[in-house]
Amino acid sequence: MRLSTNILSTTLAGLTLLFACGVSQGADTNKGRQLYATNCAICHGPTGRSVMPGAPNFDRGEGLLRPDFTLLASIRSGKNAMPAFQGILPDRDILDVIAFLRTMH
């Protein structure tokens, strides 16, 4: 019984990790590039090098070590000077931007 519980726990943990990391599968990085240029580059820079103090430098991977669902929540809600994009961009578009960001470094 104990072995079955351990196997089940390990399987559930693995599936949770798999789904958490795989949110952007099938994302459109070209669309993400266009959305980034329109909505993000003014502060984060056209190449990902921040032009606004406090904004992460995506060209160095800053802030991109978090899973997609965490980044999605951050972009939806905004932070400090960054506006919230919930209601402005649909989640699919935000995930396209995240996928594009991951290609920058």
PLM segments and residue spans:
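Hydrophobic alpha-helical segments
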Residues: 11-13, 29, 71, 75
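Periplasmic/extracellular electron-transfer cofactor-ligation site
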Residues: 27-57, 79-81, 103-105
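Extracytoplasmic electron-transfer domains, predominantly the class I c-type cytochrome c fold
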Residues: 57-105
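Electrostatic cytochrome c docking/interface patches
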Residues: 18-35, 70
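Positively charged n-region of N-terminal signal peptides that target proteins for export
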Residues: 1-6
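Bacterial N-terminal signal peptides
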Residues: 9-20
